[in-house]
């Protein structure tokens, strides 16, 4: 993080929280999932983002890490080894247990923990977790009502079930990289871990649905959330297009989104995102731009005519927006109730007036990293607020605490540490 980025704004620091001194055992006492305990065997992005959301909602998340730690501890900007910006962003509201799961004693520790949790989440290949002895059948034998969620790359009923999967691979496989090649010579990845993050949110929904079923019936179940299938469903929600019908009148794709002119429009001093969507929007925009005749030329009152002429309309709009500044167009669009915004850079988001007003960003003191900025949970609950109670943990920060809760004696914990079955930081 650059020095300039360390300067937290006044809105953030006004309510600066000292999560560094939060008591981890008492912290998870609010939120709609308060009292729920989750055993988190995930790493990298998909699983950790999902379990962080559950933690934001009040669940007690026990993050089980290898003795080397989650891979994302080393990816991103870092002030200190093992605490990267990405790790800090997707691992708050968790307690860390560093455990050698491949050892017999480590497996015994996990078995004891399973007896006291409601949910187990992992993102290993199913064959790998089966070899460790913690496939669904083995875990359900220890805890019959557990909600067991496997985040996989590919569904286990298909021929690709054992293939490795990362975000780039899934973006390519699900059609996103192809979609993102419009106007370019080669396919390109979207510059965000969109497959990981989208599948992570799907995982949250799946876990909550399974928990609701358990609350009604008392029965746990196996839940699978495959990245590939999730992202194909995500991509085709609007892009299934002509493939919806048999025989297909056209190919896949939502035409309006695939036109080359669908991009931020140039202005005198930059660019603007403007979306005249209805016929009324387009008529008002053309009139404001001094070309009311174009509304009749393109037949904007008719949806089919708008769709047929959308590329030409985007082209004319881009020429018109060049004639005024971004601020002028924002003012015009606001008066006409046409959706529009300036182009906001990532670095400018913490100072965005709306985000400051709703308190999306928050300053906090981290036990090892000092003053940090985090993004608050965006979802609002009137009676059971989601909030940040714990900072992202150091590797093995809560090992002793978690083992004591599981019924281990101090001498047993010391023995596990000496034999490097577990490690404890701090």
Predicted ranges, named:
Residues 68, 153-155, 227-232, 269-271, ...:
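Glycine-rich beta-alpha junction loops
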Residues 193-208, 227-235, 277, 281:
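Mid-domain beta-loop-alpha active-site segment that forms a flexible
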């Amino acid at each position: 993080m650059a020095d300039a980025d360390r300067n937290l704004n006044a809105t953030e620091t006004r309510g600066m929280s000292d999560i560094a001194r939060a008591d981890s055992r008492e912290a998870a006492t609010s939120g709609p999932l308060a009292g729920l305990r989750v055993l988190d065997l995930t790493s990298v992005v998909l699983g950790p983002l999902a379990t962080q959301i559950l933690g934001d909602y009040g669940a007690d998340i026990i993050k089980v890490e290898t003795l080397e730690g989650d891979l994302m501890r080393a990816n991103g900007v870092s002030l200190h080894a093992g605490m990267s910006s990405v790790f800090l962003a997707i691992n708050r509201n968790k307690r860390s247990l560093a455990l050698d799961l491949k050892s017999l004693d480590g497996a015994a520790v996990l078995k004891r923990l399973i007896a006291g949790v409601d949910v187990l989440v992992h993102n290993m290949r199913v064959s790998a977790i089966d070899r460790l002895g913690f496939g669904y059948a083995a875990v359900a034998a220890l805890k019959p009502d557990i909600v067991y969620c496997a985040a996989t790359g590919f569904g286990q009923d298909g021929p690709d079930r054992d293939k490795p999967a990362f975000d780039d691979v899934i973006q390519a496989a699900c059609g996103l990289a192809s979609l993102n090649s419009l106007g370019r010579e080669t396919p390109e990845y979207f510059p965000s871990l969109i497959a990981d993050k989208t599948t992570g949110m799907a995982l949250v929904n799946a876990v909550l649905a399974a928990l609701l079923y358990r609350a009604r019936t008392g029965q746990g179940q196996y839940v699978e959330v495959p990245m590939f299938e999730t992202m194909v469903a995500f991509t085709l929600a609007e892009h299934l297009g002509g493939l919806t019908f048999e025989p297909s009148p056209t190919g896949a794709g939502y035409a309006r989104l695939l036109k080359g002119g669908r991009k931020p429009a140039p202005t005198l001093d930059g660019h603007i995102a403007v979306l005249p969507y209805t016929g009324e929007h387009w008529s008002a925009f053309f009139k404001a731009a001094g070309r009311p005749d174009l509304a009749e030329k393109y037949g904007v009152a008719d949806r089919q005519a708008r769709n047929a002429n959308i590329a030409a309309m985007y082209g004319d709009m881009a020429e018109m927006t060049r004639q005024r500044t971004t601020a002028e167009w924002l003012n015009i669009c606001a008066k006409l109730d046409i959706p529009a915004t300036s182009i906001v850079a990532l670095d400018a988001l913490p100072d965005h007036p709306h985000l400051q007003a709703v308190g999306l960003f928050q300053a906090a003191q981290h036990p090892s990293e000092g003053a940090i900025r985090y993004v608050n949970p965006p979802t609002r609950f009137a009676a059971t607020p989601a909030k940040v109670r714990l900072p992202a943990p150091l590797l093995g920060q809560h090992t002793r605490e978690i083992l004591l809760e599981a019924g281990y004696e101090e001498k047993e914990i010391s023995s596990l540490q000496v034999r490097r079955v577990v490690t404890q930081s701090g």
